[in-house]
A protein has these predicted regions:
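N-terminal phosphate-binding caps/lids of nucleotide- and nucleic-acid-binding domains
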Residues: 1-212
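Short "domain-exit" segments at the C-terminal end of structured domains
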Residues: 213-217
């Protein structure tokens, strides 16, 4: 037996017994019914849907052991298997074409470890939109990590193309500050040079052996 929690208008809700399968289901309806003035500041439905879908993708990629399903207006937009395999989550969340162009990488530098997938040098992309980074399990946007990734591909990728990746960087929690951005999508590293080197050498080791054909997923 499960439990149901209903929240309305931000007030406290009551927890009631409910029959439910294993897992958690979150349903959002009439989000701005009591704050209609905020509704006019929302972007188009397509943009908001893309933002929610992006959030679900990042959650799925950072927790491949959990199955995520995103339903929008009754249509399934995302479903991951939750089998604990990152490549399965990448395939489900980011698509077959992207997943099939990836090769696995892993490396370390002292107490910093780097693991995940990157595109093979001949599978460069037209933008940086498929560069996905996690630090200690948290999705972030980082110019430092982007620079380290792309420096590792220098002279190995076609000019005007960019590598794609799903990379996880793990380091001591004392070596990274996650409270530098309200959305916590940016971090400050205490040892930026060490982090850069760990990512750079992980990618460089791949490019130096001239891998041009991706692993088929």
């Amino acid at each position: 037996e499960g439990a149901a929690l209903h929240l309305e208008g931000g007030g406290p809700g009551a927890v009631e017994p409910a029959g439910a399968p294993e897992g958690t289901t979150i349903t959002v309806r009439d989000l701005f019914y009591n704050t209609p003035a905020r509704l006019k500041f929302m972007r188009k439905d397509s943009a908001e849907t893309a933002a929610v879908n992006g959030l679900m993708q990042h959650l799925a990629l950072s927790h491949p052991d959990i199955s995520f399903k995103f339903i929008k207006d009754g249509v399934e937009a995302l479903l991951t298997p939750g089998d604990g395999k990152l490549d399965s989550a990448v395939y489900a969340a980011l698509g077959r074409d992207f997943a099939r162009g990836l090769v696995p990488v892993s490396g370390s530098g002292g107490d910093i470890t780097v693991s995940g997938f990157v595109t093979a040098p001949l599978m460069g992309r037209g933008s940086r939109s498929m560069q996905v980074f996690f630090v200690n399990g948290r999705f972030i946007k980082s110019q430092l990590l982007t620079a380290a990734l792309e420096e590792g591909y220098r002279n190995q990728i076609m000019k005007g193309k960019f590598p794609g990746c799903v990379l996880s960087v793990t380091l001591p929690v004392t070596a990274v500050d996650v409270n530098v951005h309200p959305a916590k999508t940016q971090v400050k590293f205490a040892r930026e040079h060490d982090v850069f080197d760990a990512v750079y050498h992980t990618v460089l080791d791949l490019s130096l052996i001239h891998i041009s054909e991706p692993t088929r997923l």
